[in-house]
UniProtKB/Swiss-Prot annotation:
Name of the gene encoding the protein in the UniProt record: Prdm4
Function per UniProt: May function as a transcription factor involved in cell differentiation.
Entry EC number(s): 2.1.1.-
Subcellular location field: Nucleus
GO cellular component term of the entry, any: nucleoplasm
Compositionally biased tracts (Acidic residues): 758-769
Family of this protein: Belongs to the class V-like SAM-binding methyltransferase superfamily.
C2H2-type ZnF: 586-608, 614-636, 642-664, 670-692, 698-720, 726-747
Protein name in the entry: PR domain zinc finger protein 4
SMART domains listed in its UniProt record: ZnF_C2H2
The SET domain, residue ranges: 408-525
Region feature Disordered, mapped onto this chain: 750-798
Alphabetized UniProt keyword annotations: DNA-binding, Metal-binding, Methyltransferase, Nucleus, Repeat, S-adenosyl-L-methionine, Transcription, Transcription regulation, Transferase, Zinc, Zinc-finger
Gene Ontology molecular function: any one: sequence-specific double-stranded DNA binding
Organism listed in the record: Rattus norvegicus
Amino acid sequence: MNDMNLSPVGMEQLSSSSVSNALPVSGSHLGLAASPSHSAIPAPGLPVAIPNLGPSLSSLPSALSLMLPMGIGDRGVMCGLPERNYTLPPPPYPHLESSYFRTILPGILSYLADRPPPQYIHPNSINVDGNTALSITNNPSALDPYQANGNVGLELGIVSIDSRSVNTHGAQSLHPNDGHEVALDTTITMENVSRVTSPISTDGMAEELTMDGVTGEHSQIPNGSRSHEPLSVDSVSNNLTADTVGHGGVIPIHGNGLELPVVMETDHIANRVNGISDSVLSDSIHTVAMSTNSVSVALSTSHNFASLESVSLQEVGLSLEPVAVSSITQEVAMGTGHVDVSSDSLSFVPSSLQMEDSNSNKENMATLFTIWCTLCDRAYPSDCPDHGPVTFVPDTPIESRARLSLPKQLVLRQSIVGTDVGVWTAETIPVRTCFGPLIGQQSHSMEVAEWTDKAVSHVWKIYHNGVLEFCIITTDENECNWMMFVRKARNREEQNLVAYPHDGKIYFCTSQDIPPENELLFYYSRDYAQQIGVPEHPDVHLCNCGKECSSYSEFKAHLTSHIHNHLPSQGHSSSHGPSHSKERKWKCSMCPQAFISPSKLHVHFMGHMGMKPHKCDFCSKAFSDPSNLRTHLKIHTGQKNYRCTLCDKSFTQKAHLESHMVIHTGEKNLKCDYCDKLFMRRQDLKQHVLIHTQERQIKCPKCDKLFLRTNHLKKHLNSHEGRRDYVCEKCTKAYLTKYHLTRHLKACKEPASSSSAQDDEDEDGDSGEDGLPGSMTTEGCRMSSAVYSADESLSAHK
């Protein structure tokens, strides 16, 4: 075949045939060996095509699949050829016309595959009953055994039939087994490619669909001769069983292997479909938009597909890849339109041809319209331009899980141990009544020190064989039950519940009869207290050093010893801060401060120059020392690792805790360098030093006292007028400012409290205007109800 010569003279003769008088050309016209004789198939039938080649032979899907011209004229065609070398005359080829591609080229390709060329059948020559209405033969039979039965070429498309192998069929072959061919059984996959720019018309769809194939018995066909036998698949005569019918658009033909591919014009393919049995086409016919000018039609069925296998076609010098048998899934089959198959009729539902993906179009449509206007009866991307926005009615808010799970015998009220909510009894709860288990969030890897003090009180540690297994966090009301609101007792008298672990869970059990209107207050069991490292009884005071004190007076005395041991030099410290044990040889040139390293001196000097490169990400504050920034960040994160064992207050710095502990002892260890006055807190000493260092220009008209600010003078004038509007509800003390009353309430526990209240901590080193020098604190006498505005006046009264 490589030595084939297509002479120009022969080409001119071939091109002289007109479209209306097209002559099919065989291999004898081209100087090739004559192909085996074949008989023309009857005109009625289903158009089929040669099976596709594998990707190894051609870059196109098939070297034997044809895209026939859309009409009679000069429209182009596409054809894939095997990767073989052919001797052809040099270009150009003015003699090649469309008739060459419709008649000559199919014959060449068919000869290469040792298969007969396609037979051309015009659909108008077929009646509704399937018989030939008009048989036209324009070519003498002597020229080629394969004759065209119509004078009009293909215009609209093809329907392809692929060869498949069915396990249940016998291995029969149309050709003799001469070593060049393999036995094939036949299955049919129909695919209609219609080159129309508008949906297929649904007119005239009440006709019968027939499929004619060509089969032959292997034992009856000698070498060089072939017989033809039509097979029909319709809705009346054929009953296909599930084991012999394929799946996904594959319909097997009962008989021997398919020999002759038939190509038919499909202008009105829908007019040939009617009354298809559900056993043949049990699902539907689907259309998928392939391009703007073509539609692909696939027939799908729900029969078993397991019996189909791949098959290979062999020929001398030509090898076809195995024909893969694959099903048409529902997602692939359901495209932009479908044909519903019913027992009455087969109707086609047209759809618009689109190039874009249908799924993306649906998503775009879903996101485009968001609001439906019932008055306009349409959707809008936003509010209706005519009727405005719609009215939304929100759901009724529901309470958290913790509050909804509260038993009916209990209620939630303000706790007596703090500002949080506590659990109170609505009726009598008998002794040995168990509540639980405690429900919360489990954490298997958690650092308790990273939690705030409030969160630590809601952390329950669960141990297994003495090893911490996990923790139960009870901070989220939506994740916990009502037991998260039960508070811890401060002493033995308040305790009425015992908390203990069991099987990895926490339970509360009443230790006494609890009458109504009493708060549930728990403390840990003896074993559980030992596991978590707390005292066995709530009234035992535990020091940081590990010493347990049975009474508050004993614990206070023990705490005083710690203060003297840890702060020996703070009694005579200057306003610049405490002295250090290490030698401070790096002195500042702008102030008398000294440092133990040049890096600390450099950071300190940046403060004098106003350089603060370290800024806080949460607020606008900046610092020259990065350590001060780290300390400041604890304010935003709420991390307070230093906790007071007496009042459960927590602090971000150890120095603040030590300063706070002085409040409980009542000792004044900080002495002013300018006078002999003593103070408990360093902040109070710092404010007092301003009296000696800063000049006061605002003078009181009644007592000639000087103040730094006008607001300080106004507060001082209230003392002359006797206005002490801020009175403690627990005792008889009254204060000039709300700040001093708030500070007093934090330490006031008894009506006869003697010491002035002190704030727990001032993170920024400034308590505000109320705490600046000149703001005076009133003190009350224990023996009488007299109130005084200064410590000196109170001492004189005593």
